[in-house]
Amino acid sequence: MHTEKREMFYKEIEDFWHDLYGTEYALYDVHTESSHIIDSIKEAANQIGELFFKTAPLLRSLDDQTLFSLGFPKDTLPYLRLKTMDTESVISRLDFAVTTDQIKLLELNADTPTFIKELFYVNELVCRHFQVQNPNKLEEKKLALALKHAIFEAYNELDRTNYPNVVFSSHDTHEEDKLTTLYLMKLADVDATYVPLSQLRIVPSSTVEEGEHIEAGVYDQYGQKIDVLYRQTYPLEHLIEDEDPSTHEKVGHMLLTLAQQKQVAIINPPSAFLLQSKAVQALIWALHEQHHPFFTKEEHHIIETYFLPTYLEEDPFIERKQAFVKKPSFGREGDTVEIYNKDGIKIDEDQHKTYQEYTAVYQQFIPLPTATMKTQTQTIEAHIMYGCFLLNGKASAVGIRAGNQITDNESYYLPIGLK
């Protein structure tokens, strides 16, 4: 019965992936939370967002060797100091462990956060269906404004006078990425087209083809030069490695060079990638432990309250006999994450090892709280992790992913309502 109700409800939602990889993803259930907890998460998110954005100019002032030691791939170093917009990141997401007495930051996804359509759009429909209030009720309008503003700000930085050619792009073979990108394009409500990444054409320098002069730039499938390229779901660390399959040209490098030359504007901007490395948290924690004057007394208090001790080595935890998590400085969906007990013995790990080549960071382990919820087949108890989006650094929609202690790509989307 539950399965049929779920199917009937979710199949009415257009362009939504309630099942992923052939398994249940969106739960037909709602977790109710007090407005006090939601407000506390948002307050934490606002303060943490400010701290990260304050740290970005400091990162841009570091030399290449230091940035390399913070896990940034060597190929990205020439582009890390690019500042193309006022904001460091248009859409980012903070992940939290939330218990009754504390809120602790696990990580920031500043570059390509997903979970957008679920929280800004689907959550409202679920709340209406279950007749509870939606904590994210006003957030979709804010997202629409943030998108529109970002597109025109990015375009204005190019100093052009033509009507902007705005393109939203993703891998069209990945359902979640494509549908998220199409949702954002519709919400932005600007004259834009969707072009799969595979159909973009990059012209690294001005050339002549069949007697026609072609400017350096990124072109859509109709041969029109793109002004603003929105790449919400395509991580920069993947982009930088991209090669043309036939010519083996480094198209990722070319694209970022064109952004550097103001031939195209990219959103999220390259500055978002600068905050993506989890080693940035280790840097913030190191400055905090040194009582460094870079942060004010109030900011040190915020770090003490919400951040977990994070280092580029495991020794502090071994010495203090504390459990810790080892995770790659760049990584998604719990991939390559390992948990160690206070004796330094591995007790849990994600089976995927995609990001092993990246610098590791070590963070104090904090158990995720659990909650009960209904799946298609049974009522289960699962670990829950809260996400809170930042729009231009300001707290926005809140939501829950449920699953294992290591939140991976098999976790559920658990809708959230107000008590």
Q: Where do the language-model regions lie?
A:
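Preference for protein termini
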Residues: M1-K419
